[in-house]
């Protein structure tokens, strides 16, 4: 992997703690950072984002090698971590700061995301429409250090939250098998 060959992908899918591991464990992924994007304030804090006044959503930004793990595959992984029919948050996490969004960094990513969303909608997998927003990537602000790699640092808390939030059951019911 050379720095020149790396690209960025940014996804919001509810609590960012739950979004890191599915990407971090894939080949060709250099790093996954938890943070905030899509709002109107500069350098927001977790507390500010949770207040609902910043316009930001919790998100992850992935640095990846598209020759090893193409953007299309990242989008597939993304869908399988979310409830794409719920625009008002994800699982127990409600509100604008947990809204699902695919943030595209270029026109190719936009086209891939839009086609993937249309295909998922047409597939009939869900009875409700696919409402995940597709939006142009804006400034991404890394979250506080204690949020980074949460699944590694706080394994028991992370695993418990996956279950308690309803995310694990939803993924099992809608995406497995």
UniProtKB/Swiss-Prot annotation:
UniProtKB keywords: Oxidoreductase
Catalytic reaction(s) noted: L-methionyl-[protein] + [thioredoxin]-disulfide + H2O = L-methionyl-(S)-S-oxide-[protein] + [thioredoxin]-dithiol; [thioredoxin]-disulfide + L-methionine + H2O = L-methionine (S)-S-oxide + [thioredoxin]-dithiol
Keyword Oxidoreductase annotated: yes
The protein's enzyme class: oxidoreductase
Domain of life per record: Bacteria
Pfam families the UniProt entry points to: PMSR
Entry's EC annotation: 1.8.4.11
Catalytic residues of the enzyme: 15
Molecular function terms, GO-annotated: L-methionine:thioredoxin-disulfide S-oxidoreductase activity; peptide-methionine (S)-S-oxide reductase activity
SUPFAM superfamilies xref list: Peptide methionine sulfoxide reductase (SSF55068)
Listed InterPro entries: Met_Sox_Rdtase_MsrA_dom (IPR002569), Met_Sox_Rdtase_MsrA_sf (IPR036509)
Gene Ontology process terms (BP): protein modification process
Function in brief: Has an important function as a repair enzyme for proteins that have been inactivated by oxidation. Catalyzes the reversible oxidation-reduction of methionine sulfoxide in proteins to methionine.
Recorded family membership: Belongs to the MsrA Met sulfoxide reductase family.
Name of protein: Peptide methionine sulfoxide reductase MsrA
Organism, as annotated: Listeria monocytogenes serotype 4b (strain CLIP80459)
């Amino acid at each position: 992997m050379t720095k020149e060959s790396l690209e960025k992908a940014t996804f919001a899918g509810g609590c960012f703690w739950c979004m890191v591991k599915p990407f971090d464990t894939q080949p060709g992924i250099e790093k996954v950072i938890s943070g905030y994007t899509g709002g109107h304030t500069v350098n927001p804090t977790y507390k500010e984002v949770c207040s609902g006044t910043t316009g930001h959503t919790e998100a992850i930004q992935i640095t990846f090698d598209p020759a090893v793990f193409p953007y299309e595959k990242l989008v597939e992984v993304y869908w399988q971590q979310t409830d794409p029919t719920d625009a008002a948050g994800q699982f127990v996490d409600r509100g604008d700061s947990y809204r699902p969004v695919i943030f595209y960094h270029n026109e190719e990513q936009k086209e891939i995301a839009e086609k993937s969303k249309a295909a998922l909608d047409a597939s009939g997998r869900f009875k409700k429409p696919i409402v995940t927003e597709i939006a142009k990537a804006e400034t991404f602000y890394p979250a506080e250090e204690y949020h980074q790699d949460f699944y590694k640092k706080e394994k028991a808390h992370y695993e418990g939250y996956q279950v308690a939030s309803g995310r694990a059951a939803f993924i099992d019911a809608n995406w497995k098998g």
